[in-house]
Structure formats: C-alpha cells, structure tokens
C-alpha cells in the first residue's frame, strides 16, 4: 500500500525484501547504522560524516525505512567509497539472515527505540556488537513490555551498550 501511495521508492522498494547486488566493500569493516525515520537519520548524519572522514578502513552502511530519509541522504551527497544507504529489510527471519550474511557487519548501531525482534535475536546469536543510541521508552511502552518479561529480557539483553536520550 505504501508503494502505491508514493511513500516508497518504486525502484529501491525491493531493498526491503531482498539484498541488492550493489557495491560491497571487500576490504573494509562494515559498521551498520539503522535510523528508521528522517528525524533519526538527520540526528545521526554528523556522526556518520565524522566516521567516514576519520576512518578510511571502515565502511558505513546506513539503513532507514522512509522515502524522506533517503531523500535527505541524497541531498547530503554522502555516497562515496566508504558509505552506502539502503532501505531496511523487513523484520522477517529469512530476510534478516540474508541481509546479515551479505553485509557481515562488525558493529551495529540502532538509533532511538524501535524493536525489531528477528534482527535483535539474530544479531545476538551471531555475537555482533550492538549499540542503542539515543534510546528511550515511554511509561506506557514499558508497561506493555512487562507483560512479556522473558521475551523482553531476551530482546533487550541483545544490546551491548545502551545510550539513552535522557536519564529519565
């Protein structure tokens, strides 16, 4: 439905359901940063720009879920040999495995607080370092997660480092 309402890129939509055969950095460590929306993308771009500028041995893969975030990245003209933007593949187990097998990230940074169960479980299983940057949770959401304590514990223990948006 999003594709037909022009909220998706007609050509790049397939990135959400498969791994495209774009440039792959064979000789560099892949650091994967996921910022779901345009606001999260905008907030993490200064960090990405610094990483690209100061670390030639790493490759930054930035994923997002929205067309507007992709358009923002195009405007910033970040695409070079050390950076690539892709759309975040759907949180479906076989797609998650295919994506992680292709990119083989050495570090993963998720921005804000969306929870992707299949990604978190597979990342944890592969022991890939995972950081939550600018994490936050509302009281209402916290109460909901308390209903499923075992699942919550398993998912949130996937993170190696959580840097909250505030101390509250």
Locations of regions flagged by a protein language model:
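Active-site and donor-binding regions of nucleotide-sugar-utilizing enzymes
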Residues: 2-168
């Amino acid at each position: 439905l999003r594709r037909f309402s022009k909220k998706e890129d007609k050509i790049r939509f397939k990135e959400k359901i498969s791994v495209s055969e774009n440039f792959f950095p064979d000789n560099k460590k892949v650091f994967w940063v996921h910022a779901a929306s345009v606001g999260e993308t905008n907030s993490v771009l200064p960090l990405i720009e610094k990483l690209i500028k100061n670390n030639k041995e790493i490759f930054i893969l930035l994923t997002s879920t929205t067309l507007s975030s992709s358009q923002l990245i195009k405007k910033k003209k970040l695409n070079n040999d050390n950076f690539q933007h892709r759309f975040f593949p759907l949180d479906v187990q076989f797609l998650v495995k295919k994506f992680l097998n292709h990119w083989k990230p050495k570090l993963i940074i998720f921005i804000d607080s969306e929870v992707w169960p299949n990604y978190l479980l597979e990342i944890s299983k592969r022991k890939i370092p995972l950081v939550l940057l600018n994490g936050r949770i509302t009281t209402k959401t916290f109460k909901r997660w308390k209903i499923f304590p075992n699942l919550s514990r398993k998912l949130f223990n996937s993170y190696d480092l959580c840097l909250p948006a505030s101390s509250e």
